[in-house]
Amino acid sequence: MFADLDYSHPEVEKDVLDWSKWLARELPLKGVRFDAVKHFSEDFLREVITGLDEEFGPGWFFVGEFWKDSLDDMCKYLERMGKKFSLFDAPLVYNFSKLSKTEGADLRTVFDDTLVKTVPVNAVVCRIPPTSS
């Protein structure tokens, strides 16, 4: 279970598309998170996005995990995927990590070379909710 799937195989693509539509019918979903999108066919992801939009209407949110520290690669990926797709801001995470390990770090640079600064509408950042006391 949960083994790697060959998304380049037409039958696998059809099954995953059918499954995503079934899931959307069964659960009150309006968004999908795709893991490790750089390992998927972009055409297949666009087909899933289009299929869900066409069958269930607009308003879906699609986000992908593209773990790379290259802002340029991420921006090019977003350009190819279109405006309906967002990515987690991996460069921002790297910046926070780097700043946390640097004595006297300048927090004003945390947004440099990040999706949040470059294409904020397509950037997703994780928020950790405050703990209740």
Predicted feature residues:
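Active-site-proximal helices and loops of the catalytic beta/alpha 8
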Residues: 19-30, 36-128
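Conserved aromatic-histidine-acidic binding/catalytic patches
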Residues: 4, 8, 32, 36-37
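Chitinase-like catalytic core of GlcNAc-active glycosidases
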Residues: 1-26
